[in-house]
C-alpha cells in the first residue's frame, strides 16, 4: 500500500495544503486543497473518497474534482466516484454543498443514470 500525503494542514498559507491523503492512486482520504496538486490523469482514476467529517478543509475539493474529471471518466466508462462517510456527513454535503446553490449536485450530473458522484453511507466499525 502506498499513501501519498497531499495535505495535512488546517490552512492554505504558502506551501500548505488542507487534509488529503491518496492511497494506492485510487482512494482519497479526505479531499482538501492538496487534491489540486494532482494531474487530471491522477484525478481521473480516483474511485473512492472517504470523508472523516464535513469541515470545509476536508471536503473542499470534492466538487472541484468531480467537475474536473466528469468528461474524462465518462470517456473511459468509469463508474461514479463513491464518497463514503457517516450519514450526517453525507447529509451535510447534500444540504450545504451539492445543493445547486453552492455547487451542482454531482450525484445527478451529468445525468441521473450515470452521475459522477455516488454518496455512500458507512457506519462506525463497518469494514469497506
What does each model-found stretch correspond to?
Residues 1-128:
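Binuclear metal-dependent hydrolase catalytic cores
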Amino acid at each position: 500500500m502506498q499513501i501519498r500525503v497531499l495535505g495535512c494542514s488546517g490552512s492554505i498559507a504558502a506551501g500548505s495544503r488542507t487534509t488529503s491523503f491518496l492511497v494506492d492512486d485510487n482512494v482519497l482520504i479526505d479531499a482538501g486543497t492538496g487534491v489540486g496538486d494532482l494531474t487530471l490523469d491522477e484525478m481521473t482514476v480516483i474511485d473512492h473518497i472517504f470523508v472523516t467529517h464535513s469541515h470545509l478543509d476536508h471536503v473542499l475539493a470534492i466538487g472541484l474534482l468531480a467537475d474536473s474529471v466528469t468528461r474524462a471518466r465518462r470517456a473511459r466508462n468509469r463508474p461514479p466516484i463513491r464518497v463514503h462517510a457517516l450519514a450526517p456527513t453525507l447529509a451535510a454535503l447534500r444540504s450545504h454543498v451539492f445543493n445547486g446553490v453552492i455547487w451542482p449536485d454531482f450525484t445527478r450530473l451529468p445525468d441521473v443514470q450515470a452521475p459522477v458522484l455516488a454518496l455512500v453511507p458507512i457506519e462506525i466499525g463497518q469494514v469497506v
